[in-house]
Amino acid sequence: MIVIEMDNGRIIKIEIDHDAAPITAENFENLVKEGFYDGLTFHRIIPGFMIQGGDPKGNGTGGSSKNIKGEFAANGYNNPIRHTRGVISMARAMDPDSASSQFFIMHADAPHLDGQHAAFGHVVEGMDAVDEIAAVRTGFNDKPVTPVVMKRVYIEE
C-alpha cells in the first residue's frame, strides 16, 4: 500500500497492481522508497479529469533519472486496468517509453486514456482528498495557484 500524506494532513492510500504493470509498479515503489516524491507537488489539476504530480521541476517537464517501458496496449502490452475514477497511471511524453516519475490519479473516468498510458493501481482510501485537490484554484497550464504539496509518500505494509 502506498500512502500519500499531504501537507494539510490529508491521506491518499493506493493499492498497486503488480500483475497489470510490473515494471511500472516496481519503478514507482522504488521512487517511493528513495523518498523521491517527498515534498513534490500536484502540479497539474483538471477537475473532472485528473490530478498530476511527481515532477521535481513542478512544471510538467521533469522526471527521475530513468525512463521505463510503457505497459499499455498501444505499446504492445496487455494492461487490463481501465482509466476510471481513482485509478493511478503514469504520465508520459509522446514517446511510449518516456514514463519516469510523473503520475496522475483519475478524478473521473477517461476511457480515451485506456491503452495509451500505464495504469498500475487505484485509490482505496482518500478519494475525498483527491476531490479536494481537484477543487483547488488553478492558473496557467492547470497549475494550482497555491502549491498542493505531498509532504511524504511511503509504503505501508
Features from the language model and the residues they span:
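Cyclophilin-like peptidyl-prolyl cis-trans isomerases
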Residues: 1-157
